[in-house]
């Protein structure tokens, strides 16, 4: 009998559903929310309302594209955290009702684990080379910047992480200071391709170990702009592409410096990148350069698997299903939770759902 998993993702502002059958992706549907662009960032209440409107048609479309009826499902996997509580509750509540009505198990998935295991998403006829354990994964997004030692599907260790702002968060905030649109990351990426990455210099953190810090870079960028604009009020407009390229290059240098140290310290040559910022052209180029210079075997996900999506939730759910790792129907959502931590003993804020 086939194992068919429905994955549901609703941690932030993308409503997504996907179907995995025996480890192969059959469908992945994502509904994004343009409503937040006018506010320059995600508005939690608006995101939650949009999820409520989108969740049913998105799941229906995912099943339709997969050619699967709901009665054929083996389990429902859902993002339990981290994320925006109002958004998470929509996905968690739907998953509970859907699974209960079908009499099938529920599988809770850590959103961050899903990003890491996105490297194992594969579709029929798709040439997808997957990393072998153990490997290093740089997980970098708007909310997280971590270096992870991936020992197995269900065994991961955080070697280093940001002690303040995440890389994507710093880029978005600097983009906002420049008066660019939302989300800032893709806009900075596009502008950077036309600019000189060595045009401007911004401060880099000097902290021990493998942890990251991006708050200093954000402050350096802000103060530098303030000083330059005293002499030229239109400085940003005159140097937009060079500013973007220099900012991007600084972020990438910070990320790759600690990743190089981790690869050397743990003697690992298989290195992956995951998360929304992994779509950044500068970061991808840096990975390719390091592959040639240090003999790394690198793994860069498809663009469609870098941002939030249910395919990564479904594949993680599939691996957990094979281990019979289910969760109770009363499982709550968690807005804040770290990677590779058992939900059982958490005392973080929860919902009653």
Predicted features, each with a name:
Residues 108-109, 288-312:
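Conserved phosphate-binding/catalytic loops in two-lobed NTP-binding clefts
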Residues 190-271, 280-294, 321-324:
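A contiguous, well-structured pocket-lining segment that forms one wall/lid of small-molecule binding clefts
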Residues 344-350:
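Conserved small/polar residues in nucleotide/adenosyl-binding loops
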Residues 113, 150-194, 223-226:
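Glycine-rich phosphate-binding loop plus the immediately following alpha-helix
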Residues 109-135, 316:
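Conserved phosphate-binding catalytic cores of ATP/NTP-utilizing and phosphoryl-transfer enzymes
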Residues 15-20, 137, 145-149:
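Short beta-strand scaffold segments in enzyme catalytic cores
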Residues 3-82:
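N-terminal beta-alpha supersecondary unit
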Residues 115-117, 301-339:
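Glycine-rich phosphate-binding/hydrolytic loop that grips phosphoryl groups
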